[in-house]
Structures are given as structure tokens and as C-alpha cells.
Amino acid sequence: FRFFTFSINKCTKDLNFKEPFKKLYTQGMVCHETYKDESGSWLSPDEIEKLNDKEAINIKSKKPVKIGAAEAMSKSKRNTIDPEKMIDKFGADSVRLFILSDSPPDRDILWSEQGIEGAYKFLQRIWNLNILILNRSETKRDKEIEKEFNRKINNYVNKVSVLIQTFSLNVAVANIYEVYNLFNSTLSKRISNDCFKKNLVKYMKILLPITPFLAHECLEKLK
């Protein structure tokens, strides 16, 4: 979009501005390991099989592969990854959560299937938390415990909202993990199901920009 704005401005000079946006946020690069065969030719991740963190072999020739440093993904070094494969395997929410949680958006990110799998497992725990609360037996409530629980949840909601607005997305995700731990450690306390559900709705709403599919499904069940 910036390119077309510059072109129109240069060719026609009909625009009253040069930049289409008030602020440009430069994002980091997506990086991945590089691989070479014995002849020094680049290999793609689909052409190798990793034996461990330091060893890999060429799937066709079964010969050792040299594992290089993680570099920005490029066609020339053949270290690109098709995100569709990870989306098909773990879901779009898992891939999105991994990307946002790995590092600040202005720094490079190291693409990792293990990292995406970790995000997938965390989302499974959030889903299970919803099921637990929906099926939880009613308990005697303690107003003071509920008040403190509400206060903590509200603090997290406000904090995460500010972090998202300031593009501190990895820190926002870290706080989202903390909110899960707070729910998990409070399930056995004397808090009413109604209180849990109301706060769970707040939790799902701060998850919406990060994992929209899961958050929408959970919100539907909480209606």
C-alpha cells in the first residue's frame, strides 16, 4: 500500500500526503534453520529428517546434512516453511498464539514446530477449563474470596488491553498464561459458578484478538 501511495504521489502529485499511515511499525523477520548437503547445496526442511538437535540426514540419499544457523526465511536458502501445513495440523489459533508469544513483534522470530505444538496444548487446557467450569458443582460462596478473585481478573483484563494497544503482544500472551493459572488454582475455592462464568467471559474477550476461533466457541458455550 505504501508503494502505490508513493507511486501515485510521484506520478500525479494529486495527493496531499506522502505517507499513507501515521505510524509505521517495522516487524522482525521470521527465521528458520538452514540445511546443506555434502556438496554444499541448500536443502529445504521437507528434504531432511532431523535425528536430534544437532544431526540430520537427507531423506533421499540418507547422507548427513549440515545444520546451519537460523536465518531469515528466503527462497535462495530454501529455508521457507508453508504455514498452511502447521495450520492444518494444529489450527490457525495455535500458529497465531505461537507467533505472538515467541518474541516482541519488532524482533526476529525463530519458527518452531515444537513451539506451535506447545501453543496447541495450552489452547486445549483453556478449552478443558471451560468444560470444567460449565460442569462444576455449585459450592458455598465466600464473598471476600470472590471479591479478591474479581479484582485480580479485572487487573489482568486492563493490563492485557493496554499491552495489546501498545503492541507488547508477547507480554500480553504471558499474562494470558497467568490468568489461566489463576483460574486453575481457584477452582477448588468457595466461588460461585456464576462468578466463574462471568470472569471466564472476560478472559475469552481478551483472547479474541489472539485466538478468535477458540474464544468464539467458548463464548458460545458460556451464553
Predicted region positions:
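Conserved phosphate-binding loops in nucleotide/dinucleotide-binding enzymes
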Residues: T34-A92, D106-E117
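Helix-rich, typically C-terminal accessory recognition domains appended to large enzymatic cores
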Residues: F3-F4, I8-P20, K85-K223
